[in-house]
A protein has these predicted regions:
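Pyridoxal 5′-phosphate
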Residues: 14-426
Length: 426
């Protein structure tokens, strides 16, 4: 992305992957010392993650010391403005972006809606966009509504057995040259497969189109180097990635500058403000710097190499994925071994997916979720805002799925516990 900071000075990582200390990781999350949560195992992380202590501390400090407008000529205001700028700068750096390529909004759903409205103003009737059958409705639906403006909507279909999005199917959708934009998920929240974002974005660019990536279900499992992925837009929710209630939207400048401003005054010249019609939540944005604090704390505890911010973030992302792969092993083995009792949607190989498991038992999922709660297991259930992929895979959305999701802070004991609970209730 334009304005990206160089990575000079970052040593090669080779095959070395940091091994995270579970005790140290959990020590960064106040939820693990909260008495009311002590007897629970959290497998509803796809709904929302616990917040790290740095985010909580920054949010509390802002409300206590700096809850003033950031444009004043007095010390509290100057500190508020400084912290707001620092949060934007540090979040951009850990994502491999320039500071003006990161925008914030109340949620990813809101950011997607605003972006879709900008695309609506940009495209002409008869031009086409591609959406997918894997879409989460919060991101996919606003783009589908562009049909009302005469934009042709093409759907990238899933394989009906696996949920996979094939490269060949995408290329067929692009071959007539009418497509201007492709919106797709990095990971579907019910299929769980990790899509090859770098390859897809390169294919889209060769076709003369722009790419919009829904990263909500991917970012909690390791923040991406968005600049390296080649996405023109990348959206994720900080609330699902250890942070506050903010949507983060990366926009490559060559794409952003083609889009009409959506700012309230219609005339903002700042790239990062052009897609924020509701104004800024200063406290929540400032607290996003806590994500960088957390990554740096993990990195410096486990490794002393002299990497830059993006390098530290990628080293920790690899460490998170490695730990999650280890945790997935026993659970995947159990699910595959019990195919006669439960169907796992998406791949059964840890290397191909994130640890978010949508399970179909052939019965309504909500009662099973309530029974698991009696075992001290927190899980999600229902259609998970993903009725399209569920229908495509033969699961009625009204029946729904049981959704188990773990993160790098999940313990081996938690995994054993959920397996025992599933075995008792399936």
């Amino acid at each position: 992305m334009g304005g990206r900071r160089p990575c000079a000075g970052r040593p090669p990582t080779g095959t070395y992957v940091i091994k995270l200390s579970l005790d140290f990781v959990r020590g960064q999350f106040p939820a693990f010392s909260e008495p009311s949560l002590r007897d629970w195992s959290n497998f509803d992380n796809a709904g929302e993650s616990y917040a790290c202590r740095y985010v909580i501390w920054r949010l509390h400090r802002t409300y206590r010391e700096r809850k003033v407008g950031p444009e004043g000529a007095f010390p509290a205001s100057e500190r508020a403005a400084e912290e707001l700028h620092d949060a934007r700068r540090r979040v951009a750096l850990i994502l491999g972006l320039g500071i003006d390529e990161v925008a914030f909004g109340p949620s990813t759903a809101q950011n997607a809606y605003v972006l879709a409205q900008a695309v609506r103003d940009w495209l002409r009737p008869g031009e086409a966009i591609v959406v997918t059958e894997q879409d989460h409705e919060a991101v996919g639906a606003p783009f589908r509504r562009l049909a009302q403006a005469g934009i042709e909507i093409r759907e990238w279909p899933m394989d009906r057995a696996s949920g996979h999005l094939s490269q060949a199917a995408l290329e067929r959708l692009l071959e007539d040259g009418k497509v201007r934009l492709v919106s797709f998920p990095h990971v579907s929240g019910v299929v769980g497969e990790i899509n090859n974002v770098k390859r897809i974005c390169a294919t889209v660019r060769r076709a003369g189109a722009f790419s919009v990536v829904d990263g909500v279900a991917a970012a909690p499992h390791g923040l991406p180097d968005i600049g390296a992925l080649g996405a023109d837009a990348y959206l994720f929710s900080a609330a699902k990635a250890f942070g506050p209630h903010q949507g983060v939207m990366a926009l490559r400048q060559v794409f952003a500058r083609r889009l009409p401003t959506q700012a309230a005054n219609g005339a903002s010249e700042k790239d990062w403000m052009r897609f924020t019609p509701a104004g800024l939540d200063h406290a929540q944005i400032s607290a996003c710097a806590g994500l960088a604090d957390y990554i740096d704390t993990l990195y410096h505890h486990h490794d002393k190499s002299g990497r830059d911010a993006a390098g530290r973030a990628q080293a920790i992302s690899k460490a998170m994925r490695a730990r999650e792969a280890t945790l997935m092993g026993p659970l995947l083995e159990y699910l595959v071994g019990n195919r006669h009792r439960v169907r796992l949607l998406g791949p059964a190989q840890a290397r191909a997916r994130t640890p978010t498991f949508a399970l179909d038992t052939g019965r309504p999922a909500a009662p099973l979720a309530r029974r698991l709660a009696e075992h001290g297991i927190m899980v999600g259930s229902g259609e998970c805002h993903a009725p399209r992929p569920l229908r495509a895979l033969g699961v009625p959305p009204e029946r729904g799925v049981l959704r188990l999701s773990l993160l790098h802070y999940t313990s081996e004991a938690d995994v054993d516990r959920v397996i025992q609970a599933l075995d008792a209730e399936l």
